[in-house]
Amino acid sequence: MIVGIIDADTHIDETDATWEYMAGGDSSYKPTTAYPSNPDPKLPPARYWVIDGKRQIRFIRSDKDSGTTVETRELLDVKKRLKHMDELGTDTQVIYPTLFLMEATEKPEINAAMRRSYNRWLGDRCGQSGGRLRWVCMPPLQNMDESLAEIRWSKDHGACGILKKGDREAGKYPADPYFEPLYAEAEKLDLPICIHTGSGVPDFSPAREFSHGQFMRTKGAAINGVLGLILHRVPAKFPKLRFGCIEAGSMWAPFVAYDLRRQQLRQQGRESTSVLGVPLIEVPVNVFEENRIYITCQVDEDLPYIIKTVGENNLMVGSDYTHRDPSMELEFRKELQARADKADIPRSAVQKILYDNPKVFYGL
C-alpha cells in the first residue's frame, strides 16, 4: 500500500504578483505584459513578458488542456491548489518555475532582482500551505556571494532544492569549479541540486523557431549537465550532496551509462590523453546510485529496462502540473499502479518512485 505521494516536478505560472517584491532600485526592472499589436486570428491568443525591452512568452493556458485553473497555476488561491491535490491523491508538490526555465535576460542585475522577488513570492505563497507545497529556489548565479545568501534565505522559508541548468549559467557549465562554493553550501544546508530541463543561455529568437533547437535547450542540456558532473567527479567532492535530473525522462540513463563505460574503456592503455580533455574515471556498476543522482521518469517508459540500469532507489516521477506538454502526467499514480498490477514492474518500485525516493532526494 502506498503511504503517500510526493509529486517531484510541478510548476507555477509567474504572475504580476511575482514581481511585487522588487522594491527600491529593483522596481525599475519589473517585467511587464504585452500583447501582439496585430494578432493573427488563425493562431491561439498570445501574450509576452517584456524584460529589459525583450519579449519572453507568457503562456495563456487552457483549463481543459492543462487540467488546472488560473487560480491553481498562478497560486492565486493556495487552498484551491491544495484541494486539487487532494482530488489527485497527492500529499506534497515540489514547485519549479516557468519563465526561468529559459534564461530571460543577459544582465546580472536584472536577473538577481527578478530571482529575489520570485523566491520571496513563492516562499510566501507556499508558506500558506501547511508544508504541502515545497519549492525549488532560484539563486542569482552571476554573483556567488548573493547566491549563497539567497539559498540560505530560501532554506529558512521552505525551499527544498536549488534549480540549476545543465548548460552554461554565468558562462560556466555545472562541473566548473566556479560553482563549488554553491555546491558546498548546498551540501551544508541539505539542499539538492535540481538540474531541470531548460537553458541558462539567453535566446531571444522568435517562439516559432523554438522547435529547431528544442532538444538541445531542454532535455539535452539537462542530460549533458549530469554527464559533466559525473565525468569531473563533482559528486565525489561533495559526498553528501544529491543531484537530480528533472523532466528529461529516464530513457537516456542506460545510454549515458553505456557511453561512459565505452568512452573510458577506449581511453585505457593509450600513450597520451585525449586532446579533448576527457578525464579518466572509474565507472561503477550503478553510476547513478553511486553518485546520488535521482531521475524523474515517465510512467510509459521502458521501466523494467531502466530499473536494471538506474535501480529502484533513484527514480522519481512528476506530473508537470500547470504545464501542457508531453511531460504532463496528472494521473501518474494510477498508471504506475496499473503496471505493477500487471507485474510489469515490482510493487516495491512503485512505492519508492511515488514517495520514498523523492522524500530522500528533497530531504522532506
Q: Where are the model-predicted features located?
A:
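Divalent metal-dependent hydrolysis catalytic cores, especially in the metallo-beta-lactamase
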Residues: S62-R73, K83-P108, R132-P140, C160-K164
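A structural signal for short, well-ordered beta-strand segments and their strand-loop junctions
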Residues: I5-D7, D13, T92-Y96, C194-H196, ...
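Aromatic- and glycine-enriched glycan-recognition loops and surfaces
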Residues: E71-K79, M114-R116, R120, K172-Y183
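Aromatic- and acidic-residue-enriched segments that line the glycan-binding/catalytic groove
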Residues: T18-A34, E109-M114, S147, F179, ...
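Mid-to-C-terminal alpha-helical segments outside catalytic/metal-binding sites
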Residues: I2-I5, T15-T72, L76-T92, R120-Q128, ...
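Catalytic pocket-lining loop regions of alpha/beta-barrel enzymes
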Residues: G127-R134, P139, D145, I151-M316
